[in-house]
């Protein structure tokens, strides 16, 4: 029976360490700041290509590259046993950086049919850009809520600060409000793109073959 005293002692010691760590972590709460949020959209480019394999003669295709970057400006406070790492500012870049437009190889550049296909795909590009513009307020509010919900993180060593900032970044991006706003953006993009295709009867392209 006497042998059981050791694990009990270890358990008590472990609890003491846990409560000590929790107390230190709680000390960081007082250093929480109201985060400043900035959101910018990337400068975008358009590239037109013609795949060697034939596509749909009547429709082109747009591949949009989405940028979703978050730069955390951390507030780092040195305390007795380590450091408190919190959020001072989040500088986000959200939007489209590139549009790759694919046109069927049978449409020769600078011809009526080529230009007609490009004009249609340009409508899709404008809708992608307008969706991001329309969701600026929603993105700002969601990002603020996400950043404001993250408490400062305690680390013992300065070498762990970068890891704490990465953890903060992950918490922000996985926050429910950020997940939901991105789902709404994707859904709105799909609706607008389908509307463009539905409203286009192909008359502009058909005239090129008369």
Predicted segments, located by residue:
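N-terminal signal peptide c-region/cleavage motif recognized by signal peptidases
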Residues: 20-21
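Short alpha-helix carrying the canonical HExxH Zn2+-binding catalytic motif
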Residues: 110-123
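Metalloprotease/metallohydrolase-associated module, dominated by Zn2+-dependent proteases
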Residues: 29-94, 98-105, 146-210
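Short, Lys/Arg-enriched N-terminal segments with co-localized hydrophobic residues
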Residues: 1-6
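Catalytic Zn2+-binding segment of zinc metalloproteases
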Residues: 122-139
């Amino acid at each position: 029976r006497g042998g059981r005293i050791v694990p009990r002692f270890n358990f008590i010691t472990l609890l003491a360490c846990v409560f000590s760590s929790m107390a230190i972590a709680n000390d960081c709460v007082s250093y929480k700041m109201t985060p400043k949020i900035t959101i910018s959209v990337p400068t975008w480019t358009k590239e037109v290509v013609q795949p060697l394999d034939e596509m749909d003669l009547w429709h082109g295709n747009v591949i949009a590259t989405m940028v979703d970057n978050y730069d955390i400006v951390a507030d780092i406070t040195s305390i007795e046993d380590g450091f408190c790492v919190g959020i001072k500012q989040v500088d986000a870049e959200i939007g489209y950086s590139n549009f790759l437009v694919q046109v069927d190889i049978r449409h020769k550049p600078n011809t009526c049919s080529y230009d007609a296909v490009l004009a249609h795909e340009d409508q899709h590009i404008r809708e992608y850009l307008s969706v991001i513009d329309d969701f600026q307020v929603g993105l700002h509010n969601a990002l603020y809520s996400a950043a404001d919900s993250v408490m400062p993180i305690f680390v013992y060593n300065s070498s762990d600060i970068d890891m704490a900032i990465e953890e903060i970044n992950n918490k922000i991006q996985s926050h429910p409000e950020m997940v939901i706003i991105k789902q709404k953006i994707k859904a709105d993009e799909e609706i607008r793109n389908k509307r463009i295709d539905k409203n286009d009867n192909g008359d502009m392209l058909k005239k090129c073959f008369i």
